[in-house]
Structures are given as C-alpha cells and as structure tokens.
C-alpha cells in the first residue's frame, strides 16, 4: 500500500507541505463555517436531517473573523496563537459552493486580516472544502481555484461508479449526480494534482464496494478513503458482504500488481488488535469535544457541525457554546459544557464490550452522533461494531495474500475469536488464513 494521505499528521503535511522549513506545528485549529444549510442533493445517507434555505451573510462572517483575530492575540483562549500555530478554515454546508460569493469574501477578508495583523498564521493557514461537485463549474468556484489554488484543499465525493453513486447521491427529483461529480473530480485532479477521493459505505451500497474501488482506480484516483457510516442500520449480513467485497478488492490488486501503487484506507495492518491501557489510548477519538469550533449562519458557535440543528433530530436541542455577542465558552454554562466535553474519554463513554474488545484499535466513533442518538456525547454508539470486525477480517485476507505473493512473513495477526470470525467469513476461509504464517 502507498502511504496514506488522510490520517491527521498526513492531512496537516498535505495542507502545510513546507512546514518542516519552519519547524513542527504543535497544534492546528480547525474552524468551520457552515456557509449554508441548503444543498443541491438529497443523499440517502446524509446525517444532516434538517436542511433549509438559510445562508451565511458576509456581515456575520466579518464579525466572526474579527473575533478570531481578537481572540488569537489573547493568552490562553481557545483560538490563541500560543495554542494554535496554524489554522484551517473549513467550509461545509449543505453544499458550500452554493454560497461561493460569500466564501470568496471570507477568503479575501481573512487574507487581508492576516497581512494587517502580521499574523503568525500568514504562512500556516489553509481553506478546506467538502463538496458534492454539482456547482464546481460555477465561474466563481473556478476563479477561487485560479487565485488561491495553493491554499485550497477541495474534496469531491464520488461514490465509486455510476450505479453506486446514483443510488445514494441524488437530486430531489431522484436523478443521479455521477457525471457532474466525476467531471469535477477529474478536472480538479488535472488542475491541482489531487488524486484522492472518498467513498462512503452504508447498508444500501455495501455490495458495490469492489466496483467502486476499481472504477476510481481506473480514473486515476489512487488514494481512496473509504469508511462505513456510524449510524444505526448495520446487520450481520452487511458484515458478510463487506468481507467478500474486501476479498475481491484484494484479489484484484494482487492480480494486477497494484497493491503497492495505491492506498485504500480500509486496509491498515496496524489496527484490529487489543489496545493497551495507557493514558494516550484513553483519549477521545473524536475532536468534537472541545478541539474544533463551528459557526452557523446566525453566528452561534458549536463544538462541531454535528451539534447544529441541521444534524439533529427534532427532539434534540442544539449544543450551542457561545455566540457573537458573548464569545466562545465565556458564559458559565458554556464553561461547564467545555469542562464536560474535555472530561470525556474512551473509558467514560464506552460499554464494557468495547473496553475488553480484542480488536479495539482503530475502531472509531463520532461524539456528535452520540449526542444526536442518545442526548449525550459521553455514550458511545456501537452500531459500527460488526463492520469493524468484518474490516479486520478483510485485512487478514489482504495481508495474508501479500505474504503469499511476496514470500514474506504475514505481518497481520487476527485477534478476533474463532466463533465470531467464522460467523462473518466462514470456516473455510478461517482455516485457510490460519495456515498463513
């Protein structure tokens, strides 16, 4: 496998490619602008439940940016230069490019303030986007890429190939968006050299994973980040399908000598083993408990966009931690919220089965989804559990195949108990892989 591009350290290295010239960056702050609640698509797996036609205005943006720089100069604030040697301005929606005029105003004004303040962030800032690609050809989007290309990280989601993509990523009238998304992704790759893409797996499309990967590879996207959604709905049958899909992908890669020419995030030999009981391993996986800040069109601040009204069921109150009038984490109730968020650990939120799980390493969760589902970020949703097990077994197959092909020792050890493994992969595969040393 090629080196990954999307773990945190590599994400920072990609956004700040020259950072080694200036020394290590101890901390990068991510500040998210939800520039609109509106979207051109109605994706079946979208976690934003309550979209609207609300758009962030430049008047609100200007106040937010002024507040960021005001707080950055003060010691011991969540945005201070002392704590944050760089900053990523993240744009999300809905679909962010629907508000491209304001996005350009945000970037222009932020760049102006960086120069005016002689800010330490002048050389350490980037703008990040997650887009469905539908509005990519907008002339303002192209203008932004032309002017600020080196400062941008734009992710266009393409769920593999047409049938798969158009099954989930659809317009309100039911039409698919594959052609527009692929056109955007390929043009962006040609202009910026970005050869990565993201595939979101859910129960509705898990059986199309193999075709999705092979199609993206054929289009020249050799860094493929794939993940299963955290939401409820996964069953044993889905785990069996995922394992078989990972087998097919593995066979395809080795048969075509592609195993060292691409990166597929779901294959990771360093995960799927027990976690040592250390202080570092007890930290919260997710950054949505005090590390990130998001702002909506009203100027309200949140620990993460998934605590906003757009991402929550009707009976769940948004978790607001400040506004433009009072600031971030300044009111007593907000200070208590921050103290609570920062106290959340793997142990505090996990059920016993997770703490003793033999393949706990690499099993992820989303604190915002925990809040959405249970009303607290300190209760871990485990709907993804069966898929983590299947992913581990798919890795066992991949790394065993690598060992056989290269005539080397298999570097992957299966820690999942035999009974649980056989339930997903079958007895024949379990016996076959157990013989590989």
Predicted regions and their residues:
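Radical SAM/AdoMet-radical enzyme domain recognition
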Residues: 69-92, 99-231
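Long, K/E/R/D-enriched contiguous segments that form extended
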Residues: 210-281
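N-terminal [4Fe-4S]-dependent radical SAM core
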Residues: 1-32, 77-83
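C-terminal accessory region of radical SAM enzymes
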Residues: 244-275, 307-356
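Short, small/polar residue-rich loop motifs at catalytic or cofactor-binding pockets
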Residues: 285-290
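Canonical Radical SAM [4Fe-4S] cluster-binding loop centered on the CxxxCxxC motif
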Residues: 25-63
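Radical SAM enzyme core and accessory elements
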Residues: 1-18, 312, 347-437
